[in-house]
């Protein structure tokens, strides 16, 4: 298994003010793993149209678990799969296909809704030598259309086009058609903070109009691109940009996490860690939650699922768990 940490970034506090608190409650102990089994670093969380929850986490190997809508364990998907090396994200598309983004194998894998068939692989897993993935920390190779380097997330538009955050090395977003053929890209291996530049695009979502939302983690901003990957705007005042999530439904919302970064001193836990609910234009609706090690707090929100904007699933990289939260009416 590839053992590599992400780049270290300084803590960035949210600067937005006057955002109301949203009433919420946690659902303690919602997920029920198999007896004697535990989650590791919980990298990805996703739901399908039936309410089943998928959790992609790091243990002695990358593992993808499926739970039903009550939190009961159903199955493990992809056990022993060649593309599972160092989990990073899982998403479910509108046809309920399951997509696993693996940072270690440099791949994005598409599985059938029941997880029984592998339907597509984007990227290329380097050869394995002595049980270790032989990858590099730089571009792999630089600026190619089909080779990824430590990808971080995946999303789709209404036409089925595929968007990949090619995150840790290549600092870009790549667009493919529904069959995996290259269409466009923005960004590049060189880190930057200007227009059409990224410093670790870590999270990725697409709304019903085809706009692309990028959690540009190293730049502590959320970048909005049009469907052709042309720059539109950025939201810069919501702190550390780890995760972005766009809800379903006629009125969509953008949820972003001001996550508490790895190694952040405990003294700052009371000022970081909120999840913000935004209109798609960046206008804040409210915020909830706080950083901490004990439920219902969280320690480094890595990914979120918000298919239902009133029920969020949150995956934590440092507390090795996933939690369910319900937003309540005031």
Question: What are these model-derived regions, one by one?
Answer:
Residues 9-330:
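Eukaryotic scaffold repeat domains enriched in small/polar residues
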């Amino acid at each position: 298994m590839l053992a590599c940490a992400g780049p270290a970034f300084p803590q960035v506090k949210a600067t937005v003010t006057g955002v109301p608190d949203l009433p919420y409650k946690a659902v303690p102990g919602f997920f029920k793993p198999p007896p004697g089994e535990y989650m590791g670093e919980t990298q990805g969380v996703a739901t399908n149209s039936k309410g089943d929850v998928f959790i992609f986490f790091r243990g002695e190997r990358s593992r993808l678990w499926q739970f039903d809508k009550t939190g009961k364990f159903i199955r493990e998907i992809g056990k022993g799969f060649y593309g599972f090396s160092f989990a990073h994200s899982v998403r479910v598309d509108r046809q309920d296909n399951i997509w696993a983004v693996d940072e270690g194998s440099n791949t994005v894998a598409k599985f059938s809704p029941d997880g029984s068939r592998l339907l597509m692989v984007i990227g290329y897993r380097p050869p394995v030598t002595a049980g270790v993935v032989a990858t590099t920390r730089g571009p792999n190779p630089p600026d190619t259309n089909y080779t990824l380097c430590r990808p971080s997330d995946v999303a789709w538009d209404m036409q089925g086009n595929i968007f990949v955050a090619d995150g840790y090395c290549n600092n870009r977003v790549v667009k493919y058609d529904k069959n995996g053929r290259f269409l466009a890209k923005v960004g590049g291996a060189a880190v930057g903070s200007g227009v059409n530049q990224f410093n670790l695009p870590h999270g990725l979502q697409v709304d019903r109009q085809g706009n692309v939302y990028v959690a540009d983690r190293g730049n502590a901003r959320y970048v909005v691109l049009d469907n052709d990957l042309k720059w539109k705007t950025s939201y810069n005042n919501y702190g550390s940009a780890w995760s972005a999530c766009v809800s379903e439904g006629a009125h969509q919302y953008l949820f972003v996490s001001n996550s508490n970064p790895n190694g952040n001193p405990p003294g700052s836990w009371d000022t970081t860690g909120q999840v913000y609910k935004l209109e798609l234009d960046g206008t804040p609706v409210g915020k909830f939650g706080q950083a901490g090690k004990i439920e219902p707090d969280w320690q480094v929100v890595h990914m979120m699922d918000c298919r239902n904007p009133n029920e969020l699933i949150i995956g934590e990289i440092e507390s090795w768990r996933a939690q369910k939260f319900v937003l309540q009416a005031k």
